[in-house]
């Protein structure tokens, strides 16, 4: 695990530690881990803001920070957005994109789920739009989320986003800015 000697898990919350002080402690919160952490914070009468502030106060380094918008009513049509992007129907700072179709080809449910990546996956900022409900159906899981729009930030962009979030306490404004500053589908 990333060169760390010690590994701890609580649900999907992963913590790694090392004798090497320069490596610090590594906290990994993927999808379910973020929700697990939210339950822990609620039990402590804390929120994400206090947690992130505490991490920074203790000298924490933020390598990656993702923000997500859950589309509960199907406003985002990933296939249509992919076509628009491919045909130049979007104004974007980055011309890189990738459209991926995935799913199972056997059984009753042969629906493929679409994923659209906007921007380079190796950059400090890119977007991932995908059909969450179809993705979960291939795992035989149910969700009310039809589509998800993720903003994936790394290194300097991640730190800037966290600092802005802690300064303004306005996640909606931050998400709106990050999207409209990067891409527009007229």
Where are each of the predicted segments found?
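Structured, helix-rich domain cores that form ligand/interaction pockets
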Residues: 1-186
